[in-house]
From Swiss-Prot:
Pathway: Amino-acid biosynthesis; L-methionine biosynthesis via salvage pathway; S-methyl-5-thio-alpha-D-ribose 1-phosphate from S-methyl-5'-thioadenosine (hydrolase route): step 1/2. It comes from Shewanella denitrificans (strain OS217 / ATCC BAA-1090 / DSM 15013). One of its GO terms (biological process) is L-methionine salvage from methylthioadenosine. This is 5'-methylthioadenosine/S-adenosylhomocysteine nucleosidase. The gene is mtnN. It catalyses: S-adenosyl-L-homocysteine + H2O = S-(5-deoxy-D-ribos-5-yl)-L-homocysteine + adenine; S-methyl-5'-thioadenosine + H2O = 5-(methylsulfanyl)-D-ribose + adenine; 5'-deoxyadenosine + H2O = 5-deoxy-D-ribose + adenine.
Length: 230
């Protein structure tokens, strides 16, 4: 077992890197990969960079160059569930693109041509994540739909459209569906775990800057706890 862990930004992986033992650094295509162990498990951590293309490159390299057998995506997200507050966790029940539209050819909104409408995470990884929640104390965690697009969402009109298109969406972010799609094609189990940094509204840019460290730390703590469950 070797677990690939992907975060887009430094605050999303800093706690994980600090938790590594026997760390070895590699640089491929301008992306740093750090191999080592956490909780006795072999892991490779990478800060992919922001967005779907960057995440796809990093995921492919984890699978092809480092032979990871499972992938965990960690980081921050904008919340779409009123009962959740900043710092709370969403564990993926499914992952979809929210900015894809080829409905003219009979596909669902959010479904890329020749791909499934939703990418379903590995059941064992989801269960391990749910068991790991207790390590976070009073932080609330739910399973839910996570949607991905190459935009930071803070426009109320755009939020309204997204809610109409994906009424069960719990969180939105900028990498998860790309990671999930790569894992789907390589048949590698995955899970997406996101901590809320904002609520996808007009205040989101301010909230994000203020709370990204908190959200990244919560999500990373969740991943460390998950690794102890595997």
């Amino acid at each position: 077992m070797k677990i690939g862990i992907i975060g887009a930004m430094e605050p999303e992986v800093a706690h994980l890197i600090q938790s590594l033992t026997s760390a070895e650094h590699s640089l491929i295509a301008g992306i740093e990969f750090i191999s080592g162990q956490i909780a006795g498990k072999d892991v490779v951590i990478t800060r992919s960079g922001i967005g779907k293309v960057a995440a796809s490159i990093a995921t492919t390299l984890l699978i092809e160059k480092f032979a990871v057998t499972q992938v965990v995506n960690t980081g921050s997200a904008g919340g779409f569930v009123d009962s959740l507050k900043i710092g709370d966790i969403v564990i993926s029940s499914e992952v979809r693109h929210h900015d894809v539209d080829v409905t003219a050819f009979g596909y669902e909104i959010g479904q890329m041509a020749q791909q499934p409408a939703a990418f379903i995470p590995d059941a064992a990884l989801v269960e391990a994540a749910k068991k790991a929640v207790s390590a976070l104390g009073e932080v609330k965690a739910i399973e839910g739909l996570i949607c991905t697009g190459d935009s930071f969402i803070c426009d109320p009109e755009r939020t309204k459209v997204m809610r109409a298109n994906f009424p069960t969406m719990a969180a939105c972010e900028m990498e998860g569906a790309a990671i999930a799609q790569v894992c789907h094609q390589f048949k590698v189990p995955f899970v997406v775990i996101r901590s809320l940094s904002d609520n996808a509204n007009n205040d989101s840019p301010v909230d994000f800057d203020s709370y990204i460290i908190k959200a990244g730390h919560h999500s990373a703590m969740m991943v460390v706890a998950l690794l102890t469950e595997l």
